[in-house]
Amino acid sequence: MKIWIRLFAVLAALTAAPALAQLNLGASSGQLLEPEKAFQFSAHAVAPDAVQVDFKIANGYYMYRDKFHFALEAPPGAKLGKPELPAGITKKDEYFGEMVTYRKAVSIRIPVERPSPEATTLRLKVTSQGCADLGVCYTPMDSEATIRLVASESIGV
């Protein structure tokens, strides 16, 4: 019975070792930032019918262009238009092939179709994904913002 316990312990350690090594825990250099610090999110209204999503990206990190997804949780009847994503930099990814990425910062303008011209509050949900140059990619992360849109003179975009 003792041999089975030892064998199990060795197998568990061998299974966990690659994941722990990839995280580089305890290293004085090359430590990974928490995702909220590596990819600092903010969002605000830029017009009565548009919002802007901003990510400040830490040095040594990048975000994937095609991993951004946007959704409105409120108000009913409001819809997002097509996000205006900047060009970015093409990177050859060993797993995904050629991918467009952003470094340092990215700003994305999103038109908003409103059901009425009155002032309203939006609840925006943004899903994004980024990686560190160390070779570690974060799981997709969700960010949320409550944004106040001023009254507009006309309805829609």
Where are these regions (language model features)?
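Extracellular/lumen-exposed scaffold segments
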Residues: 7, 19-157
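Hydrophobic h-region of N-terminal signal peptides that target proteins for export
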Residues: 12-20
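Bacterial N-terminal signal peptides that target proteins for export
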Residues: 1-8
